[in-house]
């Protein structure tokens, strides 16, 4: 993907006299015919960032400052060993029309090694309620992708709102294709 999509786009912008410096997010779908680019954005993708940043060792502000000042190549960016997986909870009807205002129940204590991220939520009379199609996501970290997935799903199982649904196959393809990966390698999986 980097060689066939990202680098040609960045090099093309430089050739046109508009070199790119910053965050370039590519929405990509892998199809039987190959790579299909859905969109480019000059921002972090959400929830894609939620599966990557938990593995960053160090200060994100330092990385962004180095990028902004043209010194990113000189900055060593270190990643934690392990894996992260993110699962997205959606409202019924998403991505088409969906109801809003359903009360959301969250756990009193979050499971270890999980992070909860709000997206389509609102606070109505001191109650957290649904306010969008992608309501929230849960990221789990672990030594292996399998462990990270188990933690993400354990966190998601502790959340409830009417009509809530989420995919149960996140990372399954990665588990099969990475079955020979060594523990300690960095892996991530996310699909909404």
Q: Language-model segments: what does each one mean?
A:
Residues 140-157:
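Short, well-ordered alpha-helical segments
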Residues 88, 134-142:
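Short, well-ordered beta-strand elements within core beta-sheets of diverse protein domains
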Residues 2-24, 41-113:
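Active-site "cap" helix and flanking loop/linker of ATP-utilizing ligase/carboxylase catalytic domains
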Residues 185-191:
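Short, intrinsically disordered C-terminal tails of secreted or membrane-associated proteins
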Residues 100-137:
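Generic long, charged, amphipathic alpha-helical segments
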Residues 26-30, 35-44, 120-121:
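Short beta-strand elements
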């Amino acid at each position: 993907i980097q060689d066939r999509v990202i680098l040609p786009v960045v090099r093309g912008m430089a050739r046109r006299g508009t070199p790119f410096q910053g965050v370039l997010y590519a929405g990509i779908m892998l199809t039987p015919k190959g790579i299909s680019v859905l969109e480019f954005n000059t921002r972090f993708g959400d929830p894609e960032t939620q599966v990557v940043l938990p593995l960053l060792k160090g200060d994100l502000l330092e990385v962004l400052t180095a990028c902004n000042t043209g010194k990113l190549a000189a900055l060593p960016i270190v990643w934690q060993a392990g894996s992260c997986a993110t699962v997205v909870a959606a409202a019924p009807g998403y991505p088409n029309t969906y109801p809003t205002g359903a009360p959301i129940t969250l756990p009193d204590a979050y499971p270890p090694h999980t992070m909860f991220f709000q997206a389509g939520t609102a606070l109505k009379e001191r109650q957290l309620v649904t306010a969008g199609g992608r309501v929230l996501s849960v990221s789990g970290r672990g030594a292996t992708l399998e462990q990270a997935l188990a933690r993400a799903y354990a966190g998601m199982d502790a959340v409830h709102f009417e009509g809530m649904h989420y995919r149960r196959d996140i990372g399954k393809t990665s588990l099969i294709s990475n079955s020979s990966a060594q523990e300690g390698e960095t892996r991530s999986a996310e699909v909404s």
